[in-house]
């Protein structure tokens, strides 16, 4: 019985090592997908920020023109 335990323990040990390597590779693949989504989010955030800045500039210009009109009383 003792002679059977050593090979079984050895096979169990090899199986655990190979399983841990598979999990590490799978984790590395999943990390790449996460980075892509973060890059996409960053790009989307930049686009939204640029649109908001353009809208604010347009609104600010309109408000300044209205104030100038009120101050000059040329309306």
UniProtKB/Swiss-Prot annotation:
> Quick one: signal sequence residues?
1-22
Q: Tell me yes or no: is rRNA-binding among this UniProt entry's keywords.
A: no
Localization terms from the record: Secreted
Q: Which organs or tissues contain this protein?
A: Expressed by the skin glands.
Please give the positions of the paired cysteines in each disulfide bond: 69-75
Q: What GO terms describe the biological role, i.e. biological process, of this protein? A: defense response to fungus; defense response to Gram-negative bacterium; defense response to Gram-positive bacterium; hemolysis in another organism
Q: Which UniProt keywords apply?
A: Amphibian defense peptide, Antibiotic, Antimicrobial, Cleavage on pair of basic residues, Cytolysis, Disulfide bond, Fungicide, Hemolysis, Secreted, Signal
Taken from the UniProt entry, a GO cellular component term is: extracellular region
Prodomain residues: 23-40
Q: What is its main location?
A: secreted
Q: What does this protein do?
A: Antimicrobial peptide. Active against some Gram-negative and a variety of Gram-positive bacterial strains. Active against fungus C.glabrata 090902 but not against C.albicans ATCC 10231. Shows hemolytic activity against human erythrocytes.
Protein family according to the UniProt entry: Belongs to the frog skin active peptide (FSAP) family. Brevinin subfamily.
Write down what this protein is called. Brevinin-2SN1
């Amino acid at each position: 019985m003792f002679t059977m335990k050593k090979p079984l323990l050895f096979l169990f040990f090899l199986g655990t090592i190979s399983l841990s390597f598979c999990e590490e590779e799978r984790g590395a693949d999943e990390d790449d997908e996460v980075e892509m989504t973060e890059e996409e989010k960053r790009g989307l955030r930049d686009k939204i920020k640029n649109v908001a800045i353009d809208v604010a500039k347009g609104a600010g210009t309109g408000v300044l023109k209205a104030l100038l009109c009120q101050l000059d009383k040329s309306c």
